[in-house]
């Protein structure tokens, strides 16, 4: 039964609209008192980061799109934000939970003492990183292991481990974010039980256990040597440990019951429509007969012998009770997954806007909570991007945005600004956004002396996602 697939598809379709609007997903806020200089700086950062995501990072939207479909199914995904030396630019890539190893007892990545990303590269891509100085070269007999077994997800999807691309052996790397003490490098002595280990990123090739890179994982000018973060957690529902819960965990049992009930109904209908049974050997002549609708065929048999010679098996019609059970299970799953159609369109057209908003919020409580988690995670992702831009951008760079030449300065990415998603954590759908803007506009029209009509209409246009409002 497609109940889980339907829930995942509808969630993905709603979430992608909120997290990646047409005008770009980033907006800025000013920390402290705003002046004209800060406002211009905030405008430059917002304009550039949206340009960066939409134009310079073509992988951002496909990865986000794919991640938002995986997330409701498995409950936990990750995004890795880093500077890719092979592309010489910033990137943010989707990392599946099965390629990320962390202790289930960890609270979050910031306090986790160790976590590991499993990276699979072709030998050619690995050599590109070597050429960029990111990894050490492997020996002729190191790396390039054949992957003989498909992963669980690949097995479900029907993807074979063997194919035309197996000639290009895969290099499997283990990128470990951990704390370590190197004798002769760190100030502390590893034999001292009170010594404090420092954060490092240590990468090794899985098959040969060869270390291919060691990098400090703190800012060079950071006196406290705090661990830097490169990964962002995205959770569907909080789990009992580190990993979150998805639809498979919560309503997977209902999905199995619905699938079993549907199959039983189909089997029952098939047997009832295509009956078989027993017939006495030799009592009715064999062979094939073509019978047209409304036609009677002559048989060489004694009258009343046909009924006595043939006995069909008593297959029952599909059970009404089983059909009711299927409906109950599907309704229960839909209520939890919040994919049932909202009854907003069926409401009275003359009902107050507040009633419409209440109906929307009541029907989307679960999605509202999930949307707040997505908003917080995406805000962290944008802050990591802002931090990397402050380190890797040139002092001044020109870029084309909205058909005009614009400029961004590396000094713009300072602590006087913060970047957050355009999405509102309290507004989880375009329907709710439009209803709220409509309520404001109606109140403004009823008491124009108490409201700024320009601002009321502007909010309505913004809720409708109309471009070029100022024109």
Q: Predicted segment positions?
A:
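N-terminal-proximal low-complexity accessory segments that begin disordered
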Residues: 1-34, 38-84, 96, 100
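C-terminal anchoring/interaction modules
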Residues: 1-2, 29, 37-52, 66, ...
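Long, basic N-terminal domains or extensions that often function
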Residues: 87, 93, 99-100, 119
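Extended non-core architectural segments that shape protein topology and connectivity
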Residues: 91-94, 103, 112
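Serine/threonine-rich low-complexity intrinsically disordered regions
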Residues: 173-178
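Protruding loop/beta-arch "assembly-hinge" segments enriched in small, turn-prone residues
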Residues: 238, 244-249
């Amino acid at each position: 039964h497609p109940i889980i697939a339907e829930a995942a598809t509808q969630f993905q379709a709603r979430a992608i609209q909120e997290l990646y609007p047409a005008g770009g997903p980033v907006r800025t806020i000013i920390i402290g008192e705003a002046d004209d200089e800060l406002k211009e700086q905030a405008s430059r950062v917002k304009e550039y980061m949206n340009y960066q995501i939409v134009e310079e990072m073509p992988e951002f939207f496909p990865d986000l799109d794919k991640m938002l479909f995986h997330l409701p199914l498995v409950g936990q995904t990750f995004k890795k934000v880093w500077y890719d030396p092979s592309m010489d630019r910033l990137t943010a890539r989707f990392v599946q939970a099965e390629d990320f190893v962390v202790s289930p007892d960890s609270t979050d990545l910031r306090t986790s003492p160790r976590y590991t990303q499993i990276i699979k590269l072709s030998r050619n891509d690995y050599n590109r990183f070597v050429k960029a100085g990111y990894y050490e070269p492997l020996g002729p007999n190191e790396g390039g292991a054949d992957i003989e077994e498909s992963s669980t997800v690949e097995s479900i999807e029907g993807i074979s481990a063997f194919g035309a691309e197996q000639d290009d052996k895969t290099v499997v790397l283990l990128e470990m974010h951990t704390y370590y003490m190197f004798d002769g490098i760190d100030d502390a002595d590893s034999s001292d039980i009170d010594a404090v280990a420092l954060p490092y990123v240590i990468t090794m090739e899985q098959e040969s256990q060869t270390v291919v890179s060691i990098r400090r994982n703190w800012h060079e000018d950071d006196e406290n040597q705090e661990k830097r973060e490169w990964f962002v957690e995205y959770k569907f529902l909080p789990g009992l440990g580190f990993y979150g819960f998805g639809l498979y965990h919560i309503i997977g049992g209902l999905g199995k019951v619905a699938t079993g009930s549907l199959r039983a109904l189909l089997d029952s209908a098939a047997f009832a429509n295509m009956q078989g049974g027993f017939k006495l050997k030799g009592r009715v002549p064999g062979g094939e007969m073509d019978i047209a609708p409304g036609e009677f065929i002559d048989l060489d048999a004694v009258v009343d012998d046909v009924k006595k010679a043939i006995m069909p098996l008593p297959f029952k019609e599909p059970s009404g009770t089983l059909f009711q059970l299927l409906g109950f299970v599907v309704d229960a799953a839909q209520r939890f997954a919040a994919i049932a159609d909202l009854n907003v369109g069926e409401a009275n057209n003359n009902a107050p806007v507040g009633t419409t908003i209440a109906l929307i919020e009541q029907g989307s409580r679960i999605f509202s909570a999930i949307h707040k988690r997505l908003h917080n995670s995406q805000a962290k992702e944008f802050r990591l991007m802002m931090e990397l831009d402050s380190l890797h951008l040139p002092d001044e760079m020109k870029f084309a945005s909205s058909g005009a030449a614009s400029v961004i300065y590396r000094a713009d990415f300072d602590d006087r600004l913060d970047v957050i998603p355009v999405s509102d954590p309290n507004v989880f759908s375009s329907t709710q956004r439009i209803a709220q803007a409509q309520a404001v506009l109606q109140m403004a029209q009823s008491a124009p002396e108490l409201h700024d009509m320009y601002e009321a209409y502007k909010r309505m246009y913004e809720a409708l996602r109309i471009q070029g409002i100022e024109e």
